[in-house]
Amino acid sequence: MATFEGRFTDAQGLRIAVVVARFNDLVTGKLLSGCLDCLHRHGVDVTPESSQLDVAWVPGSFELPVAAQNLARSGRYQVLITLGAVIRGDTPHFDVVVAEASKGIAAVARDTGVPVIFGVLTTDTMQQALERAGIKSNLGWSYGLQALEMGSLMHALESEA
């Protein structure tokens, strides 16, 4: 029986794209900072001159899937991370955006075979979003770690095939 696991120490040669929603950038900017900190601490070059990492900004979480799809289809990246924050309001807009963003991001991963980390916060209040982006913890760090694990796992699976 073979057992496959991703490792967090296998960042060399890994190309990562991060797609960030600009809407609620008070939150998404903090998620990005946490994500980049994690990647840097695990050996990914996150400098502006990096050939390992690219960051793409989109208007909002609804637009995350189309940008992620374009990047995944380019063949340049082994893993993508999507970062967004959708905060419930008084209208059904929240439900539409969350549903389409999550379905779209999942479809990109399925259709391209490139892992896409779902880093979209869905909260009832801005306070809850800020707590998840740095006040209590920064989920951006977790999303970076998930990307490293999935990139490493995919490499292990491809090597075995």
Curated annotation (Swiss-Prot):
Enzyme Commission no: 2.5.1.78
GO MF annotation terms: 6,7-dimethyl-8-ribityllumazine synthase activity
One Pfam family from the record: DMRL_synthase
Record-linked InterPro entries: LS (IPR034964), LS/RS (IPR002180), LS/RS_sf (IPR036467)
Annotated catalysed reactions: (2S)-2-hydroxy-3-oxobutyl phosphate + 5-amino-6-(D-ribitylamino)uracil = 6,7-dimethyl-8-(1-D-ribityl)lumazine + phosphate + 2 H2O + H(+)
GO CC annotation: cytosol; riboflavin synthase complex
Family stated for the protein in its record: Belongs to the DMRL synthase family.
Protein name, as recorded: 6,7-dimethyl-8-ribityllumazine synthase
